[in-house]
Amino acid sequence: MLKRRRCILFPILGSLVLFMGAVDPTVNSLRAKEARAATELALARPGEILFVRAERRRRLAGLPAATREKLCRAPVRKWRSTKAVTTIRATPGYGGDNRTERFALTVMQAGAAAFGAGDRKARRAVVRLIARWAKGRAMTKLEDPEDASSYYVVERTLLPTIVTYWLTVRGDTRIKASTRARIERWLEGLVRRSRETRIDLTSDEVSARNNHAYLAAGVVMAWGALTGDLGMVETAVAVYRRAIAEMRPDGSFPLETMRGARALWYQRHAVASLTVIAEMAAVQGIDLYGYRVGKRDLHRAVAFLLDGIEDPKRVWRYAKANVNPGPIRDYRRQDLGFLRRRAHGRHYMAWAEIYMARFPERAESRRLAALLAESQPDFRPMVDEYSGGNTSCFFYTPPGAAGNRAESGQRE
């Protein structure tokens, strides 16, 4: 697996047990079981990713026009193109190369506008933009092939690009076959690189077991669902199940909650990627929302996050490890900036739209809705790379309306 940038390496391998406790023997015993279970998977709807397009179009058509426009049409007067970023730079310190962010935002906004609002200009713009990046072999080179954060930048850009490609390009015969083929080769190459370099279920390295692995698995899951590649889906499912197995019984993720002032920030990060994987699996008839190891499941992770936001002291005993905490050194000052839309247009709670649509009757969903409204009354639309794009356009369901509720995995 990849090494983290030297300047932010954790002093972790020798003292990980201080933060996590001994490795849960459940994890090792699950590996053989998961290998057997993988052979039982099948894809119910290959070609679909986050939702069934025809069903979502019908639901959007049933919304008032003003609501649909607000959710899906972006406040953009003129869509601008951006030059392909062929080489991802290894940036010093905390974070990563941000030169792909403008591309990603355009892809997310224009993709939703094209799909949900029928915006032809947005569709033309995003098709041209994705084609330009494919032709420019964007993100295919890494300045430092050992830098985990560089792969992370690629994957957070890649997920919404795959989703928008699915919604606007793939299968559209109005687009030249050669253009579609070039885009598909470009995307597939990036996905396969992530699978080969970022996912190792036998590794104990941090980036193989934390939010990095979950994001990579989301990318692999999306491509596997789209192309009908069962092997890729099996890989993503295995990463999800390992994450649940390594969760603490209280719902916290050890490698996220040890992150000092950003303990809840990274708990939310993990929940976001796992929710996306579970939703893509549900579309394919695979129940990951209901997957449990003892009392551990995704719902418990969501509940821990909500409890920690309500009373940050609940995470202090883990956060005090203060491992790679970011700009704030005091672990007692939990960074809750993810509760509001960021200055660059993203809302890091966009995953909640997926969860609330899937489980409208759960207490966690009601708490999420109240929390988001309290933090920022006009919080929709929510757009974020880690959730695949504009989840409000893709998932919002009015209160009381029939949504995507799944009975599996619900706990009263």
Q: What function would you assign to each model-found segment?
A:
Residues 24-202, 214, 282, 290-412:
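Extracellular glycan-targeting catalytic surfaces
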Residues 152-268:
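Active-site cradle of extracellular carbohydrate-active enzymes
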Residues 140, 230, 246-250, 288, ...:
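Alpha-solenoid repeat scaffolds
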Residues 277-280:
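Amphipathic, soluble alpha-helical interaction motifs
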Residues 2-12:
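Bacterial N-terminal signal peptides that target proteins for export
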Residues 261-271, 292-299:
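Short, well-ordered coil↔helix boundary/capping segments
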